[in-house]
């Protein structure tokens, strides 16, 4: 019998049939028709593409055919972030690292760009070892565009911590504390105070580190990273070991699967 190639449901069913049979070449013949058909919902195209690109073995075996599909999708839907990011990752997978960077850069000011898209670009810039000036300029663009986005604000603070510009990192996290206070979000406030404690430790300012951790636990007594770090750094001083053990036990009980928290608890017991 003849297949009705004008029926989207039929095309999808036939593609899925060949997939189950292991005939990937025939499956892609029908997938290509689906992806090119303007009647097919964009969400369905996003879902089907992600299925194939997430399967790395399949992706490697069909790199060029999937690449052709992705290129077609970026032409048909030039502002769709799923397809934009898929093409960028496709270029990276093919070794075209600078071309991928230029492509991501061209699309970062699109109206459809999200805070996560900026973070992806920033991480890629760090991977490519772009200059500090370029990265910092992009960080500023991101936080200006998405003012009040805590993920971006934290990322910016972590970046300055990583490059040991602790003063700038502290300033950013203090902004976060003020923002959390205004929002009356105690968990967020605790989170930023914990980050500040980590920086003070890196700076060798022990008392300010402990004060920040203490304040963080006032706003969220179950802040696991703070409980763990406070316990560990306090134990290094040889003081307050009972308090350190209590915090280490609590951190471990709140996340039993994390080996770091188990190690901290064992370390504090050893110090006692």
Regions from the language model: what does each represent?
Residues 1-272:
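Alpha-solenoid helical repeat scaffolds
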């Amino acid at each position: 019998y003849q297949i009705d190639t004008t029926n989207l449901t039929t095309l999808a069913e036939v593609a899925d049939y060949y997939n189950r049979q292991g005939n990937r070449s025939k499956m892609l013949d029908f997938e290509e028709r689906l992806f090119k058909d303007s009647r097919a919902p964009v969400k369905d195209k996003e879902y089907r593409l992600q299925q194939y690109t997430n399967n790395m073995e399949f992706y490697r075996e069909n790199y060029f055919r999937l690449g052709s599909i992705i290129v077609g999708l970026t032409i048909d839907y030039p502002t769709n972030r799923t397809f934009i990011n898929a093409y960028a990752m496709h270029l990276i997978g093919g070794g075209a690292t600078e071309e991928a960077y230029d492509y991501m850069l061209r699309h970062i000011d699109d109206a459809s760009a999200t805070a996560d898209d900026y973070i992806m670009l920033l991480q890629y810039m760090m991977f490519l070892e772009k200059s500090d000036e370029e990265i910092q300029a992009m960080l500023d663009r991101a936080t200006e565009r998405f003012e009040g986005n805590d993920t971006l604000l934290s990322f910016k603070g972590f970046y300055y911590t990583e490059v040991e510009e602790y003063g700038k990192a502290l300033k950013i996290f203090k902004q976060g504390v003020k923002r959390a206070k205004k929002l009356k979000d105690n968990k967020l406030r605790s989170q930023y105070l914990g980050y500040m404690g980590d920086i003070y430790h890196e700076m060798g300012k022990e008392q300010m580190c402990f004060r920040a951790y203490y304040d963080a636990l006032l706003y969220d007594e179950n802040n696991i990273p703070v409980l763990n770090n406070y316990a560990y750094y306090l134990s290094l001083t040889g003081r307050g070991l009972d308090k350190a053990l209590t915090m280490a036990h609590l951190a471990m009980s709140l996340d039993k699967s994390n080996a770091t928290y188990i190690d901290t608890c064992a370390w504090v017991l050893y110090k006692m």
